[in-house]
Amino acid sequence: MMQLKEKYKKEIIPKMKEKFGYKNDLAAPKLEKAVVNVGFGKHVKEKEYVKHIQEILEKITGQKPILTKAKKSISPFKLRQGMIIGAKVTLRGNRMYDFVEKLINITFPRVRDFRGINEKSVDKTGNLSVGFKEHLAFPEIAVDDVENSYGLEICIATTAKSREEGLELFKLLKFPLKNS
């Protein structure tokens, strides 16, 4: 599954150098990390639900998730400081490239009513944020075994210096972006 990394080195870097006038290969923006995040929401106190989500995240990413804790108390939400409120996985290197390739080629086409990622999902520093309403689009999840579906967020960080560089990188990587 290392085709994306090889494609980046052989095809994308020369195109980025030509378009933006970089003198060095290392000046071209590249993918830095991919973060997959799930918030537990109203199920915070249900230990079985938390454990189930951790297992699903591990299946999807191939890496054990870490639990995220609340930074401060918010009484209307019945949230206390230090309470576990979600789980996240940070992927770097080869695992990140494998995950992003799977995301582009397998997961996005499996999403119901998917019409592309809005270009506004790329921020001013060239990072992409995508939210999924249900986790069933991932190939590791057997639809028959699922009791309830939940959403997750994926943030892909790049070394791009501007939004234009980030957008061009994602277009060259064949992300299904649509014009806003």
Where are these regions (language model features)?
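Ribosome-associated RNA-binding proteins
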Residues: M1-S180
